C-alpha cells in the first residue's frame, strides 16, 4: 500500500470530526426534562441524533445502560434512593428502642439499690403525723437490756447513749424500754411491801445515785409509754 492511503484516511477522519463539531447543536448539552433525567438513555439518544457520523445509536454495542444493568429498567433505578431511606428506618427505630431500654435498665438498677438501702432507726421520720407502731426487739437486744436492768433500773444519759450505739437503737427506744420494764417490775413486786422500792439484787449503789437526776423526768412518762406499748 502506498502512503497516500493512510494520509487520505487520516484526512477523512479529521474531516468527519470537523463536520461533527460544526453540526452539533448548542442545546445538546442542556439539561433534559425531569422525565429524562432519571437515566442517561434518553439523553444519549438525543445527543446521538445530532451527531450521526459518530456512532450508530441502534447498534447493540451502544444500547441503553438500563438494558444491560442486571435486567432492571429506568423506573427501578429511579426508586433506589427511596429504598435506601426505607432500609434506614428500622435502624433508627431500633436505636430509639435501645435508648428506651437503657433508661428502663437504669431505673431498675436504681430501684434495686434503694431496696437494698438500709434504713436505721434514727433515719425514720419522727414528726407528729407519723403513725407509731410497736417496737420489736431482737433476742440479743432484749438480753442486753435485761442484763442492764438487772444492775440499774435507771440509766444516766451517758449510759443510755452507750447502750443505744451498742444495740443500734435510739435513746428514745432505750428510754421507753426501761420505763415499761420498771412498770412491769413494780406490778410484779406490788405485794412485797416496803422492800419493793429497793434496788434489784446486785445493783450498784453508785449507779443509782448518779441516776437520781433522770429519775424524776422518766417517771412522769411511765404511764403514757405503757399505754402506747399495749
Swiss-Prot record:
Residue ranges of the TM segments: none
Organism per entry: Pan troglodytes (Chimpanzee)
UniProt KW keywords: Developmental protein, DNA-binding, Homeobox, Nucleus, Transcription, Transcription regulation
GO cellular component, one term: nucleus
Main location per the UniProt record: nucleus
Biological process annotations from GO: anterior/posterior pattern specification; regulation of transcription by RNA polymerase II
Motif placement: Antp-type hexapeptide: 119-124
DNA-binding region: 130-189
This protein's encoding gene: HOXA7
Biased composition (Acidic residues): 216-230
Function description: Sequence-specific transcription factor which is part of a developmental regulatory system that provides cells with specific positional identities on the anterior-posterior axis.
Comp. bias regions, Low complexity: 194-213
Protein name as it appears in the record: Homeobox protein Hox-A7
Record localization: Nucleus
Amino acid at each position: 500500500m502506498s502512503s497516500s492511503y493512510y494520509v487520505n484516511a487520516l484526512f477523512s477522519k479529521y474531516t468527519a470530526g470537523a463536520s461533527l463539531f460544526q453540526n452539533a447543536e448548542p442545546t445538546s448539552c442542556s439539561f433534559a426534562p425531569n422525565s429524562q433525567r432519571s437515566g442517561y438513555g434518553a439523553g444519549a439518544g438525543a445527543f446521538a441524533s445530532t451527531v450521526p457520523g459518530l456512532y450508530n445509536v441502534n447498534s447493540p454495542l451502544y444500547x441503553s445502560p438500563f438494558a444491560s444493568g442486571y435486567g432492571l429498567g429506568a423506573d427501578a433505578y429511579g426508586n433506589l434512593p427511596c429504598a435506601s431511606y426505607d432500609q434506614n428506618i428500622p435502624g433508627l427505630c431500633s436505636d430509639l428502642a435501645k435508648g428506651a431500654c437503657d433508661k428502663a435498665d437504669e431505673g431498675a438498677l436504681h430501684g434495686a439499690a434503694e431496696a437494698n438501702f438500709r434504713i436505721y432507726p434514727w433515719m425514720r421520720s419522727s414528726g407528729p403525723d407519723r403513725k407509731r407502731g410497736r417496737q420489736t426487739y431482737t433476742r440479743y437486744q432484749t438480753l442486753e437490756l435485761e442484763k442492764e436492768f438487772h444492775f440499774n433500773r435507771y440509766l444516766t444519759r451517758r449510759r443510755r447513749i452507750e447502750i443505744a450505739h451498742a444495740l443500734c437503737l435510739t435513746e428514745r427506744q432505750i428510754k421507753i424500754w426501761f420505763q415499761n420494764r420498771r412498770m412491769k417490775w413494780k406490778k410484779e413486786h406490788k405485794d412485797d411491801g416496803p422492800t419493793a422500792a429497793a434496788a434489784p439484787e446486785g445493783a450498784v449503789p453508785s449507779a443509782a445515785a448518779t441516776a437520781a437526776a433522770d429519775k424524776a423526768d422518766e417517771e412522769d412518762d411511765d404511764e403514757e409509754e405503757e399505754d402506747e406499748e399495749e
